[in-house]
Amino acid sequence: DLEKTKNSFDLAKEFAKKLGKDKKIILFVGTKKEAKDLTERAAKELKMPFVKERWIGGTLTNFKQIKGRIDHLNDLKKKRETGELDKYTKKERLQIERKIEKMEIYFGGLAENLKFLPSAVLVVDSKHEKITVKEANQTKIPVVALLNSDCDPSGVNYPVPGNDNSRTSISYFLSEFAKSYKEGIILAEQESATADKPAKEQPLVINH
């Protein structure tokens, strides 16, 4: 039903616009092969955190521990950049380098932009990402999802029916969502500029 799909997508885009206006963080999740690079690209475009490899259980429900892993990764990368790792032996440096590489696979997409729990989670294929959806539900985080029409939309606040196996469909879903988020940012800037503008002086009227 095209009309139903359009209405669902309009609701999701309106939500994206509101998130953009309020400068909220969205966690993008797309771990199936058709979605990995597209998910990463859309998230990076908005400077948002993303997961494109295996979802690490507890990313939302045990965020404090996950945040500790992210901080550790960022600390190691910083030490590598500043040359602090030079004091270690060649063998030790190699071990640390391997550790960074391994952590990058699972936490690299979260390292820069996930300082606290996100305000929304966007998933490509809610059936494939059912653990993510479950964790989002447990932590009361709204879920936006592209899902096949035969998928169970329960647990998804903004379901968008579509072909979640088609790269064209996934790309369109992600780019439209990102576009709406950007529209929200522009809207906030316009409202801010209007609020900052001094009120136009009214002519002085003297009643005789």
What are these regions (language model features)?
Residues 1-163, 167-193:
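Ribosome large-subunit tunnel/peptidyl-transferase-proximal elements
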